[in-house]
């Protein structure tokens, strides 16, 4: 995962500068507690799982996403937070937490894989 750049001009922030994977759309609050991010080349797979993880954060008041059009490879992701944090910090934490969750699932799956390779499933036919 690419590191986010320092926030100097919030309207032009890119988390992955070479391809501008994540940008902040115009219309955000001045204190960055209410921000809509546009994430390129992502869909419901990331959107729903990231929304779920971010909503577990008690400082988040609202989190949702939309796919503007099925033929466009982009997702709009909205985060509104309490005044004690920013949507940018919440997004960073949410992405880190989602990576940790995926790593834990992969680890558990890998642990069980050798034990279950001899088990086959019979289908009545």
From Swiss-Prot:
Q: Which UniProt keywords apply?
A: DNA-directed RNA polymerase, Nucleus, Transcription
Localization per record = Nucleus
Instruction: State its role.
Output: DNA-dependent RNA polymerase catalyzes the transcription of DNA into RNA using the four ribonucleoside triphosphates as substrates. Common core component of RNA polymerases I and III which synthesize ribosomal RNA precursors and small RNAs, such as 5S rRNA and tRNAs, respectively.
InterPro entries, per database record: RBP11-like, RBP11-like_dimer, RNA_pol_Rpb11_13-16kDa_CS, RNAP_AC19, Rpo11-like
Family statement drawn from the similarity comment of this UniProt entry: Belongs to the archaeal Rpo11/eukaryotic RPB11/RPC19 RNA polymerase subunit family.
Query: Which Gene3D superfamilies does its entry note?
Result: RNA polymerase, RBP11-like subunit (3.30.1360.10)
Question: Which GO biological process annotations does it have?
Answer: transcription by RNA polymerase I; transcription by RNA polymerase III; transcription elongation by RNA polymerase I
HAMAP family named among the record's database cross-references? RNApol_arch_Rpo11 (MF_00261)
- Molecular function per GO: DNA binding; DNA-directed RNA polymerase activity; protein dimerization activity
Nucleus as a keyword of this entry, yes or no, is yes
Subunit structure as annotated in this protein's UniProt entry: Component of the RNA polymerase I (Pol I) and RNA polymerase III (Pol III) complexes consisting of 14 and 17 subunits, respectively.
Q: What is this protein called?
A: DNA-directed RNA polymerases I and III subunit RPAC2
Gene Ontology cellular component?
RNA polymerase I complex; RNA polymerase III complex
Q: Which domain of life is it from?
A: Eukaryota
Please classify the protein's predominant subcellular localization into one broad category.
Answer: nucleus
Q: Which organism is it from?
A: Schizosaccharomyces pombe (strain 972 / ATCC 24843)
